Regions:
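A charged, aromatic-enriched C-terminal amphipathic alpha-helix characteristic of glycosyltransferases
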Residues: 247-250, 261-293
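N-terminal pre-catalytic "stem/leader" segment of glycosyltransferase-like enzymes
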Residues: 1-56, 225, 229, 245, ...
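Donor nucleotide-sugar binding/catalytic pocket of nucleotide-sugar-dependent glycosyltransferases
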Residues: 93-129
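Aromatic "clamp/platform" in nucleotide-sugar-dependent glycosyltransferases that forms part
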Residues: 206
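Conserved catalytic-core segment of nucleotide-activated headgroup transferases in glycan assembly
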Residues: 124-126, 132-180
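Short alpha-helical donor nucleotide-sugar binding micro-motif in glycosyltransferases
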Residues: 89, 193-198
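Extended catalytic core of nucleotide-activated donor transferases of GT-like folds
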Residues: 25-107
């Protein structure tokens, strides 16, 4: 029997989704433990400094424990080159990322000597489905701060065309033209109802990120908007509207105004079925466990 420790290091919306899926779709001979010291396999979530992951892997190795790394971010970390992470990945039993890490290694001239699982994050179609609401918000966005997730650009563009933004956060003093859901991130049914009231959903995270709202919003009939980056196109090609990031606010705001001035492409049943298949948490989590055992 494999004893696995998969608990998140912090209360993070995205990591919690991964943890839930790993537990829900694990083989019957996996036992989950809440004490890291009792585990044969420890899942680590890499979203910040490399050294913390590296120190943990070294400590686990000294205790004859294996580590699996979920590479949540790379370009936005203080160690943004693949060479910085090679020793981490090579020591891990498995590395899972939405990034094509072997391809990035090859582009940077680095060897690929690690067990890799290339997979996206997922969506639960049981909860995320379209409801019959008026789409009174031009776009829904998850953003805690004015300068994060492109909230400033989104709100500026929406105000220019006289439309309202829905922010999936607690209320803040960001001025008119924004409404708030309050903290509902752990309530999938409520999230789905709000997504169903949005014409667009924002996937406008700068630098990197998988952007769960893209696929959750799509299942609820909201068309995603993403920056035109390879890490987004590889998963969302044909599903999202892409706008350039490189030109900054001077280019982003007019691109958003152009989209907000037109009705979004309707999300078809075929697209929803594609999302269900491509981003199925069951398939994704089972693939992880198969590679751990493989």
């Amino acid at each position: 029997m494999l004893k696995a420790f998969v608990e998140p290091p912090l209360d993070d919306f995205c990591i919690n989704r991964i943890t839930q899926a790993l537990k829900r779709y694990a083989p019957s001979d996996v036992k989950f433990v809440t004490d890291e010291a009792a585990a044969n396999l420890v899942v680590l979530y890499a979203h910040g400094r490399r050294k913390h992951i590296w120190w943990t892997i070294c400590r686990l190795k000294n205790h004859h424990q294996r580590a699996a790394v979920v590479q949540m971010s790379l370009k936005s970390t203080p160690n943004s080159q693949t060479a910085d992470w090679l020793n981490v990945w090579e020591e891990a039993a498995l590395v899972w990322s939405y990034y094509d890490l072997p391809h990035l290694c090859q582009e940077e001239g680095n060897p690929v000597n690690f067990n890799f699982y290339h997979a996206p994050l997922g969506v639960d179609a049981t909860f995320f489905k379209e409801s019959a609401f008026d789409r009174k918000y031009v776009i829904g966005i998850h953003s805690k701060g004015w300068s994060r997730e492109s909230l400033e650009e989104v709100v500026t563009a929406a105000r220019a065309v006289g439309l309202t933004v829905l922010n999936f956060e607690s209320e803040k003093d960001f001025g008119e033209g924004i409404e708030y859901t309050g903290l509902i991130k752990n309530d999938d049914a409520a999230l789905a109802r709000y997504y169903s009231q949005c014409k667009y959903v924002s996937g406008l995270r700068r630098v990197e990120g998988f952007e769960l709202p893209v696929i959750e919003g799509l299942m609820c009939g909201a068309r995603p908007i993403c920056f035109d980056l390879p890490s987004y196109r590889i998963w969302f090609e044909g599903l999202a509207e892409f706008i350039p990031e490189a030109g900054g606010r001077a280019q982003i705001i007019p691109a958003l105004i152009n989209l907000f001035n037109q009705e979004p492409r309707g999300v078809s049943h075929a697209e929803k079925n594609l999302v269900k298949e491509k981003f199925n948490w069951g398939h994704i989590a089972q693939g992880f466990w198969e590679r751990v055992y493989g």
